[in-house]
Amino acid sequence: NPRPRLFRLPADRAIVNRMGFNNDGSAAVAERLARRADREHADVLLGINIGKTKAVPVEDAVEDHRLSTRRLARFADYLVVNVSSPNTPGLRDLQAVEPLRPILAGVRDEAADATGREVPILVKIAPDLADDDIAAVAGLVGELGLAGVVATNTTITRDGLRTDAREVEALGAGGLSGPVLRTRAVEVLRLLRTELDRDRTVISVGGVDSAADVEHRLSLGADLVQAYTAFVYEGPQWPGRVLADLAAGERS
């Protein structure tokens, strides 16, 4: 999407973004990952996110996902199917079970064909889904034998912000992230842990700002925790500080 496309809301430690899936495409990424495979640190776990290309019609979404999977699955320790970005027109419509089923099944099958192994597949969902729809996605994950769910992406709501509403409106469209997302992200985590079998993975993301947030998500059944907005505000040493705080908590 055209710039400007990323905005800070300092009063809320939040971000509004309408980045879109701006990248060089799966073919170029595959070339870079092939070079990485021969380098130091190639043993670091690598999760690869894929999503529908903006220019691809919704009716061609299955094949578009299969193409990305065909090119990238061999490099992935796990794959995430992102159908929840608010910045690609029509993408969130693919979260409904009927259009989502062939996409996820196609990615699963393509990954197995391309690698000769079972690549863990997760689906990334929006916080704006109704609880019934979240439960339906969880059911689909079980039905297709997928690894789990990443919850959640950014929200299109603007509720609970300290920043003046006129200032927020002037920024335009985009997904909102940061601490304001925490309450809903926790609600979705609780719901997924109820709906999914315990051997399915839940990666919790949204409003994670501290070691206490990480500990809380893990206590509610998250298997992994992700963060982004706090990284932007706190800088590249922030993850290390969180890990140090977690380790100190374990020692105490």
What is each PLM-predicted segment?
Residues 41-48, 113-129, 194-204:
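Short beta-strand/loop segments at the ligand-binding rim of alpha/beta enzyme cores
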Residues 53-66, 92-95, 99, 122-143:
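Active-site glycine- and acidic-residue-rich loops that bind
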Residues 1-42:
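A gly/proline- and charged-residue-enriched helix-loop-helix capping module
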Residues 148-158, 207-208, 214-241:
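Glycine-rich phosphate-binding active-site loops on the catalytic face of alpha/beta enzymes
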Residues 63, 129-143, 193-198, 208-225:
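Catalytic cores of alpha/beta
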Residues 86-99, 140-198, 237-238, 242:
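Glycine/Thr-rich beta-alpha phosphate-binding loop at enzyme active sites
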Residues 29, 81-82, 124, 149, ...:
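Conserved, mostly hydrophobic/aromatic
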Residues 1-12, 159-174, 229-252:
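C-terminal helical cap(s) of enzyme catalytic domains, especially alpha/beta-barrels
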